[in-house]
């Protein structure tokens, strides 16, 4: 069984304190695939309740680019997410306002790198208390994007719809994400304002540990365009410590390989 909170989101077993990720592209030379330079990707720090409290992000050169912090109240409800550059300058922030029961009533996002852009979100809930809509809008009141959530009769999230609005507030794109009973994404697709498919659909498969093992994308004619297959090495806890990602396009035979390493430290 997985733990609660962010341990479950990352399919982590055991009381993980740190998760360090490194990545390496593989190059094909002399009849075999060999790793190129390995570089750090990101690091997650969890508190003893299994919630992410700090995140380090690294750029393509392996240099630290962002430092993230997440803060919670005494009951574990999220209150603030901040990302700063290595010098301490603010890059972005998310401020959460909740009611007495911990239900989110408003969220304010500030993008501080480049032009300062502020957006607010006010979610809407059904009678059972489940979030059914989240509308984001700019300071002048124009709409930015809207999320719509649909649930199974048993209560699990079944589908998330994302509508992105153009400058005239017409729908520019619609993204559909479908989930299985375990909360795993099993299908994604993107449609233009006329309802035509412009990305995907892509289907996903998982192993018994909740790790993604395959992603298959169809082209606009319905044929198979590409596949991405994932294989894993596991530690004694059942957590993956190495993931090999193999991407192939069907028509051209183009192939890329990426290895991701995950070093875990436990409480």
Question: Where are the language model's segments positioned?
Answer:
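Buried hydrophobic residues that stabilize the cores of well-folded domains
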Residues: 1-267
């Amino acid at each position: 069984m997985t733990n609660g909170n962010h341990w479950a989101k990352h399919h982590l077993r055991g009381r993980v304190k740190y998760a360090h990720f490194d990545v390496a592209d593989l190059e094909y030379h002399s009849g075999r695939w060999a790793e190129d330079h390995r570089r750090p990707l990101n690091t997650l720090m969890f508190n003893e309740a299994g919630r992410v409290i700090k995140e380090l992000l690294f750029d393509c050169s392996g240099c630290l680019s962002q430092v993230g912090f997440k803060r919670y109240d005494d009951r574990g409800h999220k209150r603030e997410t901040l990302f700063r550059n290595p010098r301490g300058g603010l890059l972005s922030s998310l401020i959460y306002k909740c009611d007495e029961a911990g239900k989110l009533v408003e969220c304010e996002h500030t993008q501080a790198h480049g032009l300062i852009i502020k957006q607010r979100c006010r979610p809407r809930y059904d009678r059972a208390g489940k979030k059914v809509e989240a509308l984001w809008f700019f300071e002048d009141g124009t709409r930015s994007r809207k999320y719509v959530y649909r649930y199974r009769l048993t209560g699990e999230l079944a589908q998330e719809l994302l509508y992105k609005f153009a400058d005239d507030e017409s729908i520019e794109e619609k993204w559909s994400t479908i989930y299985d009973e375990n909360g795993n994404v099993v299908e994604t697709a993107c449609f233009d304002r006329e309802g035509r498919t412009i990305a995907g659909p892509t289907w996903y498969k998982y192993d018994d540990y909740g790790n993604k093992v395959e992603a298959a994308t169809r082209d606009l004619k319905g044929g198979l365009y590409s596949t991405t297959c994932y294989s894993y090495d596991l530690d004694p806890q059942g957590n993956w410590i190495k993931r090999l990602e193999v991407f192939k396009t069907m028509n051209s035979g183009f192939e890329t390989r990426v290895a991701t390493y995950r070093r875990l430290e436990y409480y």
